[in-house]
């Protein structure tokens, strides 16, 4: 009986802990060409997140403190097409995805993680931020809103 109760408690804890992360990935694309099409169709900015999701401490912190926050997720859903360009060490990726991510990293001169690149719907580079963004989701959103205003 104790083992059964412990098992149920462990499952409940897993669901509780993983819940906030489940929705974040669903809005993020990994296919850059598809993201470009969506950005054009919706006249939205394209936010490229160059990350090392399974090893980069600053990337994980940025995800946790900015990108996974409901304030950012709500803003992104209405205003952005978000693309994760991941360079994992252990997480499996297709060869096509690795190739796409390497080519984009080269195109945008990515030398460290995290790096955010924001493009207009027509592909013009509007903003780049290298490293961890320390000021939280509200300040990050404010920066993105400045780009909209020109």
What is the predicted role of each segment?
Residues 1-10:
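Bacterial N-terminal signal peptides that target proteins for export
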Residues 9-18:
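Bacterial N-terminal signal peptides
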Residues 19-25:
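Sec/Tat signal peptide C-region and signal peptidase I cleavage site
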Residues 28-29, 68-99:
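Thiol-based oxidoreductase modules, predominantly thioredoxin-like and allied folds used
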Residues 28-46, 76:
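A short beta-strand-turn-helix
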Residues 43-46, 51-55, 112:
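Short pre-active-site segment immediately N-terminal to redox-active cysteine/selenocysteine motifs
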Residues 51-67:
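Conserved redox-active cysteine motifs that mediate thiol-disulfide chemistry
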Residues 65-67, 103-150:
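Non-catalytic, surface beta->alpha helical segment in thiol-disulfide oxidoreductase systems
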């Amino acid at each position: 009986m104790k083992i059964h109760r412990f098992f149920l408690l462990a499952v409940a804890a897993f669901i509780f802990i993983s819940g906030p992360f489940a929705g974040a990935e669903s809005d993020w694309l990994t296919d850059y060409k598809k993201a470009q099409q969506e950005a054009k169709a919706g006249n939205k900015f394209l936010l490229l997140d160059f990350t090392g999701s399974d090893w980069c401490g600053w990337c994980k912190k940025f995800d946790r403190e900015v990108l996974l926050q409901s304030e950012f997720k709500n803003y992104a859903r209405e205003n952005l097409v978000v693309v994760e360009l991941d360079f994992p060490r252990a997480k499996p990726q297709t060869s096509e995805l690795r190739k796409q991510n390497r080519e984009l990293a080269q195109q945008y001169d990515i030398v460290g993680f995290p790096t955010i690149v924001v493009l207009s719907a027509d592909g013009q580079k509007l903003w780049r931020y290298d490293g961890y963004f320390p000021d939280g989701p509200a300040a990050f959103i404010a920066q993105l809103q400045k780009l909209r205003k020109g």
